[in-house]
C-alpha cells in the first residue's frame, strides 16, 4: 500500500554500560508546516502508519529507558502523492560535527577559523574572534603580539551549526513537483544495504558541510569507498542522482576518489578550485543567493567547490565570477546533477523549490 510508510531504526548499544540499553522509543511527528507533537512511545524498532495524500510528514526518534531519554535522531521525511508512479529517496549524508581547522606545525599553532570554523551541534556562542597570531616564537608574549591573540569580531555572535533536519527542505522542494512519492533515510542505513536502492527512480544525497578532517573525532568522508561502489552500481542500473554539498569534490583526494568524480558524477576538479565569492549563483533561469555568511538561523557555506564538467557533461550553474557551480549529465545510461554548494543553503524557499523542479525535470524527463 503506497499510502503507508514504515519507520525503522536500530538502537545504539553502549558497550560500556549494560543498564543504558533502550527499553522503548519515542516517535515524534510533524505534518505540513506544524511543529512536532509530544511523541508516541513504542516498544519495537519499527512503526507503520498511514499517510494523508499531499501532506509532508517529518519524524525523529529518541531512545528511552529508566534513566531518561536520548538525544534525538536526525529528522526524516515522507510524502505520499496518489498520482505518482515513481519514488524519490532523500538521503541525509550531512552528519559532521567538528571543531575549527587546526594549525600545528614547526612554526605555527592555533585555530584557523577563516579556513574552517567547524560545525557545532545546533547554535553556538563559542567564538570570540579570529586568531591573529599563530607564530610559536611569540609564545609567552602578552598582548596583541602573543601567540593565540584574537580579535573580537565574533563576540556575542550566535552561529548556527548542523540541525540534522535538511531532509525537510529537500522533501518540501521535491513535493512541489506533485509527481513523486518521497521517502528518506540516513546515509548509514542507505549505504549499509538496509534498503534496496534500485527501487528508487532518483536519489537526492545531502552532503552539506560533510568532509573528512584530521582533527575530527569521527570519519566524515563525503563519499566513503562503500558509498562510491554502491552509487556506481545504482547508476549502472539506470538510477538518477542529485548530489549537493560544499566539499563534494575537494574532499575527494585519492586516485580512486577522483575516478569516482569523473566516471560517476562527470566532474573534473582541481585542488585550487574553492570559491569564496559564492553569495550569488545563476542557472536554470534562476538567480539564487546563498547563506555564505554566519548567522543564527541556518548554517553557512562560506567556501564552496568549483566543479567543471567532463566532456560528456555540461556546466549547469555558475557563481558570480562565472566559475562553474553545478555539473549536469544526461546520458542514455543514467542522469546526474551535482552542485558544488549545499542546496539547502539557498536562502529563498521559492527559488529552492523552482531549482529542484528544474533539476528533476532535467533528470527524469526521457531523453529525446
Question: Model-derived features: where do they sit?
Answer:
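Pro/Thr/Ser/Gly-rich low-complexity, intrinsically disordered linker/stalk tracts
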Residues: 1-20, 53, 67-86
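Extracellular low-complexity, O-glycosylation-prone stalks/linkers
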Residues: 13-38
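Short S/T/G- and acidic-enriched coil/turn segments that sit immediately N-terminal to beta-strands
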Residues: 42-47
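Beta-strand-rich modules
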Residues: 48-69
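Aromatic-Pro/Gly-enriched surface loop or interdomain linker
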Residues: 72-200, 206, 361-368
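Solvent-exposed loop/turn segments at secondary-structure junctions
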Residues: 94-98, 187-190, 208-213, 241, ...
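A glycine-rich, often tryptophan-bearing local segment used as a flexible ligand/cofactor-contacting loop or short
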Residues: 209-304, 308-313
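A glycine-centered loop/beta-turn motif at secondary-structure junctions
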Residues: 236-244, 285, 292-368
